[in-house]
Amino acid sequence: MRALRFLIENRNTVFFTLLVALVLSLYLLVYLFSHTPRPPYPEELKYIAIDEKGHEVSRALPNLNEHQDDEEIFLSVVIPSYNETGRILLMLTDAISFLKEKYGSRWEIVIVDDGSTDNTTQYCLKICKEQFKLNYEQFRIIKFSQNRGKGGAVRQGFLHIRGKYGLFADADGASKFSDVEKLIDAISKIETSSTDLKTTKPAVAIGSRAHMVNTEAVIKRSMIRNCLMYGFHTLVFIFGIRSIKDTQCGFKLFNRAAILKIFPYLHTEGWIFDVEILILAIRKRIQIEEIPISWHEVDGSKMALAIDSIKMAKDLVIIRMAYLLGIYRDNKKC
């Protein structure tokens, strides 16, 4: 009875103490599950390519900040790759054909080999040399000695590009590469709408498959896959990204101003990195345009559907709570 009387008489103090304990416990839990990008190993700060004489060379990667005024490269294409010898050729053929015709030599492809075990790097070097006849000016490979995750591969690639614009594109070629023109047009409109003539307005344009929700490409997916997809989209909506219908499309374009404001601050190295990119853009008031693109299903996904879907849901909660609690800060580089 004394204990009950004490609780009643001191209910405000008890409630406050329990609330503080709950918040501290939540903070500790989120902190323990939060992400910190792995620092790159020395060999991951170099790129592998073919020189003018056809020899394989390894050279230091450029730094993103060192090429802010480099207009020689209009578009950099970052392709995260993990065991992609069976799929990447079609994607590269489509991309390189378009890039040569549209931009001449003002482009580069940066493949980030995320610790592949199927000789993806050597395969890409071979087709670069023998089929595409490209050298280090336009075709570079960053090779990870250990798998970091798709987000880690994309982040590392974007931190070392030279282009005015940077495109992240999946290696499977599911997206029609020429649709990059739609994304560039969208960003150009954002840039020209700015009244500040001294600086470029940060802008992001993302490919979207939302318009295909009732098409054969989506309907033919398994019921489990579609249920997980709708469940994930609902969770993303609940956790605050309500203006974007398709957060996971592997076809996203950024101008250099947006790249500098997003990628050095990106924590997540797993599948959910797309969502953190958009969260950072929204928090930093960077304009995002969602553009419908052509897309088709390609076999050979590296995603373990059930396990990775659960992990993505967990990581989504962690990301949102980490920003809310101040564990992640959008003004502190990782």
From Swiss-Prot:
Its EC number is 2.4.1.117. Its main location: endoplasmic reticulum. It catalyses: a di-trans,poly-cis-dolichyl phosphate + UDP-alpha-D-glucose = a di-trans,poly-cis-dolichyl beta-D-glucosyl phosphate + UDP. It is a single-pass membrane protein. GO terms for biological process: protein N-linked glycosylation. Keywords: Endoplasmic reticulum, Glycosyltransferase, Membrane, Signal-anchor, Transferase, Transmembrane, Transmembrane helix. Pathway: Protein modification; protein glycosylation. It is an enzyme of class 2 (transferase). GO terms for cellular component: endoplasmic reticulum membrane. It comes from the Eukaryota. InterPro entries: DPG_synthase, Glyco_trans_2-like, Nucleotide-diphossugar_trans. Residues 1-12 are lumenal. Disruption phenotype: Leads to a loss of UDP-glucose:dolichyl-phosphate glucosyltransferase activity and a concomitant underglycosylation of carboxypeptidase Y. CDD domains: DPG_synthase (cd04188). Residues 34-334 are cytoplasmic. GO terms for molecular function: dolichyl-phosphate beta-glucosyltransferase activity. It holds the Pfam family Glycos_transf_2. Endoplasmic reticulum membrane-bound UDP-glucose:dolichyl-phosphate glucosyltransferase involved in protein N-linked glycosylation. Belongs to the glycosyltransferase 2 family. This is Dolichyl-phosphate beta-glucosyltransferase.
